[in-house]
Amino acid sequence: IRRFSELHRQGREDDSRLEARIGAFELAFRMQTQAPEAFDLSRESPATHKMYGTDQKTTKDYAQQCLLARRLVERGVRYVVANVSGKWDSHGNVRDHEKVAATCDQPVAALLGDLKQRGLLDETLVVWGGEFGRTPTAQGSGRDHHPHAFTMWLAGGGVKPGTTYGATDEFGFYITENKVHIHDLHATILHLVGLDHERLTYRYSGRDFRLTDVHGNVVHDILA
C-alpha cells in the first residue's frame, strides 16, 4: 500500500488538494484511534464526577457533556458544543426555567473551575447563550419570544472577567445602553479565536457578504 501511495504521489508533490485529502484521512484515523479514550469518563476521579454532578439525576446529562467537553479541549479539539436539554421555550409555564436551570448551574460552574485549575481557561473561549430571550410580560403562564433584549455571557479566552456590558430599561423590554447586535457578537468571537471577520468577505451577485454581514464590529470593551 505504501508503494502504491508513493507511485500515486509522483508528479503531484505540489498538489495542495492531494495533501489536504491525505491530511483529512490521517486526521480521521487519529480521531478513530483516540476517541474511545477521550470519551471514557470512567477515567476521571470520583471527586471530579462529584464536582460536575454526574452522580445526580438532575445534573447528570449536562454534567457528562461538560466533563466530556473539558476532556476534548484537553486533547486539542478546537470546537465543542454542549446542549442543555429542557423546556427553555416556556410559552406555557415559565416556572420550568427554575427546573432547567438546576440541570446546568453546577456542571457549567464546574467546567469553568476545572478549565481554570488546569490552566486551560485562558486559551479556551466559553460562550453561553441562545437565539433569543423571553418577554418581560406574561403570555398565559409563560413568556413569548423576545429578540429585542437578552443576555449572553463569555468567559476565558481573552474576555475581561467580571464585566457587565450593556443595559436595558427597567422592564427589560429594550436596550438603552451599549447595544450589541448578533453580528457584533460574531465579530468579537471570531476576533477572540484569531480571525478577522472583515477578511472573510466575499462578493456574490453584486454585493458583499460575510459571517457578520457587512456591519459587525468587535466589542473591544469586553476584551482583556
Where are these regions (language model features)?
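Ligand-binding pockets and gating/stacking loops
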Residues: 1-224
